[in-house]
Amino acid sequence: MEREGLIELKINVRDYSKYFLSQNPFPAVGVPEEFPRITVDRELIKLRFQNVISEVINTNKTIITVMVGEYGSGKSHLLKLFRNSVNAQLLTRETGALAVYVKSPGEDFSDLFFAIVDGIGKELLVDQINRFLNEELNTSDYSKLIFDTSIRDDYVQKKATIRQILSKSQYIEIFKRISKKYFGQIKSTDAIFSFLNLAHPDNSTKAWRWFLGQRLGKEDLEALNADQEIDVNNAYQLFLDIVNILRIMGIKHLVILIDELEKITLLPSTKRAKYQDQLRQMIDDNPSGMCFYFAIAPRQWDALTKETTALVRRLAANWYVLDDFKTSETRELIEAYLFSVRTPDYKADKIRNVLPKCEPSLYPFTNDAIDAISKKSKGVVSNILTLGRISLEILQEKPKQYPVVTPELINKEIEKI
C-alpha cells in the first residue's frame, strides 16, 4: 500500500535465466569501461597500434597518429584498451613504456597537463619514486641528515623504510642533494621537490594536490619547498620537466592517448590558436621516445584540417578512419556479450531442438534480428549495445508476445535510440 506523497518501491530483479543468461550483458550507460573486457573485430586497428608502439620502442622516434571516428564508434574504448595493454606488458625496467589516457584536452595546456598527471596516477608515481629513493638512499650515505637516532641506526643497517627516513630527517636537504645529483637539467625546482615529496608520508597529499593544480596555502607550499602553483603560464614548461623526470625514473617511452580532440575546435579563435601552437610545440619539443595518439570525430576533423596551421600539418601526416560495424561485426559483438554471461546450463543442442530459427550462440536473438539491429544502429557500436540491452528488456517484459528477439520487436517496440 502506498503512503501519501510516496510511491511504493519494489526492488525487482530481472530474470534472464530462461535465455541461459545470468543477467543482461549489455551496458546500461554508453560510457567506456576503464578496463574494457570485450573488443570485437578492430584487428587492423589493433595491429596499427602494435606497429606504432614497436616503432617508438625500437627506433626511439616520436610517432603521431590520429584516429577519426563517429561518436559511439568505440574510440574511447580502444584508447583505454591501448593504455591498459601498454601498462600491463611494457611498463617494465627493460622497456620502460608508460601509457596515459586523457579524456579531453580541455581548454588550454594547463588542463591537458593536469589530465596527464591524473592519468598517470598518484600510485604509479609514488611507486616509481619509492623505487628510485630506495636505491639512492641505500647506495649513498644520508645518515647525518636523519635526526631520529633509532631510525638512523635502522638506516645504517638498511632496515628503515622510505617513509620512516623522510619523516624523521631533514628531508628538504636530502631532496636538495638528490636534485643536484640527478635533476640538474630540470628547470623547475618546484617540480623536482613536489615530485620527491610524493614519497613523504606527511607531504604526499599536498604534493599531489600541487600537481593537480589545486590551491595550496603558504605553509603547504613551504612544506613542499615550492614557490608557486601551476597555471596556464607555467604548465607547458612543467610538462617538459615531468617528462624528463619520468625518464630519469626509468620511463623511457611515454604514450599519450588524447580523446575528444574536437574540443579544441570549439574554443574562441585567439585561444584556439594559442593552444594549437602549444600542442604543436609539445610535438616538436619531444622528437624521441613519445607517442601522441589522438581521437576526434569526423566533422570536427574536417573543420580542423581546413585550417593551415603547423599543428594540422603534423597531425594530417598520419590519420585513419574508424569504420562503422558491418552486419558480420554486429553479430560478433552481440555474440561476445551474450557469451560473457552464459549460465552453466547453456547447451547448444537444447536451443537447436526447441528454436531452430535461433543460432545457439546468438540465442535469444534470431539472425534476422541481427540484420535489423545492424540496420537500425547504422553500425555505430554504442547504438548496437543499446539496442541489444533494450531488446532483452522487452523480451523479459513481454515473453508471450516475443519468445525471442525478432525484427518485429526491434522495429515496432524500439522507436529511436
Predicted regions and their residues:
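Short, surface-exposed basic-aromatic patches at helix termini and helix-loop junctions that form
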Residues: 54-58, 81-94, 281-285, 309-314
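C-terminal alpha-helical "lid" subdomain
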Residues: 2-5, 165, 177-180, 187-198, ...
